[in-house]
C-alpha cells in the first residue's frame, strides 16, 4: 500500500471516529476555527508605504491528528518574505470560561524542517503522541468579544525575547481580517502600528463540526468586516 493511500485511509478513519465527539465543544470553540481560517497577507498595507513592516504570509487551517484527540485542532504557519518561517504550530482548542477559548500550541516532528507552505498537514494523520511536544508557558486564551471577533494574546514559541521572557503577539481575529501587535524585545521589526492582514483564499472546510453548526462568518449579522 502506498504512503499516500495509507494517509488517505487514516484521514477517513479519523473523521469517522471524531464526528461523535463534536458536540462536546461549545459553539465559540468552533467559531474560532471558522473565523481564523484561510490564507492571509499584509500586501495591501505594504502598498500604503508601511515601510517598517515585513511582507508576511499566514496559513491557518483545521487539521486532525487523531493521536492528540478528536477535538478541534488547527495548524498555523507565519512566514516572512516567503523565505523564513517565523511561527509554525499545531493547536488544540478547548473551552475556557465564559466566552473564552483555551489555545494550547505544540511543536511537532518536522516543524522546523520545511520552508513556507511546504509542510503537508495530512502528515498529522500518521503522527503519534511522541511526535508532539509543548510547554505550559505556550498556553493562552482568546476571548470572543462579539459574534465572529476574537481578541487575545498568541505565544511566540520559536524564540524568546532579549530578556529571556516569552513573547506574546496581541491579536484580533475577524472573519476575513486579522491584526497583530508585535511586542518589544523580539527579533521582528517593531512598530507601534499593528500588522493588518486580509484573507486571500477561500476558507478551509471544518473537520467534524456539529451537524447543526453555522459559522458566524456565514451569518448576515456577523460584525466581522467581510470583504
Q: Model-flagged regions — what are they?
A:
Residues 6, 23-55, 63-66, 73-227:
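Calycin-type beta-barrel ligand-binding domains and close structural analogs
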Residues 1-3:
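N-terminal secretory signal peptides that target proteins for export/translocation
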Residues 5-22:
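Cleavable N-terminal signal peptides of Sec/SRP-targeted secreted and luminal proteins
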Residues 59:
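Conserved ATP-binding subdomain of kinase catalytic cores across diverse folds
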Amino acid at each position: 500500500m502506498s504512503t499516500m493511500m495509507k494517509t488517505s485511509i487514516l484521514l477517513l478513519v479519523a473523521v469517522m471516529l471524531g464526528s461523535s465527539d463534536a458536540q462536546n465543544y461549545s459553539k465559540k470553540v468552533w467559531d474560532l476555527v471558522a473565523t481564523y481560517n484561510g490564507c492571509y497577507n499584509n500586501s495591501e498595507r505594504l502598498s500604503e508605504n508601511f515601510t517598517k513592516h515585513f511582507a508576511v504570509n499566514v496559513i491557518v487551517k483545521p487539521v486532525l491528528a487523531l493521536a492528540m484527540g478528536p477535538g478541534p485542532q488547527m495548524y498555523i504557519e507565519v512566514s516572512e518574505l516567503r523565505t523564513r518561517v517565523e511561527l509554525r504550530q499545531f493547536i488544540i482548542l478547548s473551552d475556557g470560561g465564559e466566552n473564552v477559548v483555551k489555545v494550547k500550541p505544540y511543536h511537532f516532528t518536522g516543524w522546523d524542517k520545511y520552508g513556507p507552505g511546504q509542510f503537508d498537514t495530512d502528515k498529522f494523520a500518521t503522527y503519534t503522541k511522541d511526535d508532539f511536544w509543548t510547554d505550559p508557558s505556550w498556553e493562552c486564551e482568546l476571548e470572543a468579544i462579539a459574534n465572529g471577533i476574537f481578541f487575545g494574546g498568541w505565544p511566540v514559541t520559536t524564540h524568546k525575547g532579549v530578556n529571556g521572557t516569552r513573547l506574546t503577539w496581541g491579536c484580533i481575529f475577524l472573519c476575513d481580517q486579522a491584526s497583530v501587535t508585535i511586542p518589544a524585545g523580539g527579533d521582528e521589526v517593531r512598530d507601534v502600528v499593528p500588522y493588518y492582514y486580509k484573507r486571500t483564499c477561500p476558507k478551509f472546510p471544518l473537520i467534524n463540526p456539529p451537524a447543526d453548526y453555522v459559522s458566524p462568518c456565514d451569518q448576515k449579522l456577523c460584525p466581522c468586516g467581510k470583504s
